[in-house]
């Protein structure tokens, strides 16, 4: 999409909850976004890659956000399977 000056701009792109696939609307101020950086085991420095998790306010309100983050990180291999 172009604005009045002719520059290309992006439209609003809503985020989706990583746990429930719900759309997170603009007024959901209880939602959180966690970015976990990959760390090089040899040097201990953060690599250029990271993994992002978004949890909507409804999941946080139910008190299930910690279980969702653990489940998602186990699936991605960040946490051990026997955690």
From Swiss-Prot:
Pfam families: Ribosomal_S21e (PF01249). It is found in: Cytoplasm, Cytosol; Cytoplasm; Rough endoplasmic reticulum. InterPro entries: Ribosomal_eS21, Ribosomal_eS21_CS, Ribosomal_eS21_sf. GO terms for cellular component: cytosol; ribonucleoprotein complex; ribosome; rough endoplasmic reticulum. This is Small ribosomal subunit protein eS21. Keywords: Cytoplasm, Endoplasmic reticulum, Ribonucleoprotein, Ribosomal protein. Component of the 40S small ribosomal subunit. Gene3D superfamilies: 3.30.1230.20. One of its GO terms (biological process) is translation. PROSITE patterns: RIBOSOMAL_S21E (PS00996). The lineage of its organism: Eukaryota, Metazoa, Ecdysozoa, Arthropoda, Hexapoda. One of its GO terms (molecular function) is structural constituent of ribosome. Belongs to the eukaryotic ribosomal protein eS21 family.
